[in-house]
């Protein structure tokens, strides 16, 4: 019985790894990166409002949101796959693919800035950010 459970688990893992290696569908890639950018916006909006005084300052919430943005900022690049740039459902311009190195540098700069912001926000002090 134990041997059968191990074999079933192994077969399941092998099947999952085969699916993970399959080429992603461009539509799925578009949905993936749009979802991430929506989550980034969801967190940045209140942060901006706190900085502008439109919302009361909440250092704990700001810090949490900054950490979310730092984590999320590392995720979108993998969603920019060939065939996902000129779709009607995407605002990603074909120029991104043509100028990949420049785009990659800018995304890396965003990741670095988000990490710096998250670190500064840990204090909860508005003046630190």
Predicted regions and their residues:
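Repetitive helical segments and hydrophobic/amphipathic motifs
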Residues: 11-12
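N-terminal signal peptide c-region/cleavage motif recognized by signal peptidases
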Residues: 15-19
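Bacterial N-terminal signal peptides that target proteins for export
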Residues: 1-8
């Amino acid at each position: 019985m134990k041997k059968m459970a191990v074999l079933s688990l192994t077969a399941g893992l092998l099947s999952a790894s085969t699916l993970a290696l399959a080429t992603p569908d461009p539509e799925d890639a578009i949905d993936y990166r749009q979802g991430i950018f929506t989550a980034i916006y969801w967190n940045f909006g209140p942060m901006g409002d706190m900085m502008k005084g439109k919302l009361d300052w909440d250092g704990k919430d700001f810090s949490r949101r900054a950490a979310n943005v730092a984590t999320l900022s590392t995720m979108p690049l993998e969603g920019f796959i060939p065939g996902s740039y000129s779709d009607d459902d995407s605002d990603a311009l074909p120029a991104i693919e043509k100028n990949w190195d420049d785009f990659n540098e800018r995304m890396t700069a965003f990741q670095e800035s988000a990490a710096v912001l998250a670190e500064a926000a840990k204090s909860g002090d508005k003046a630190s950010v």
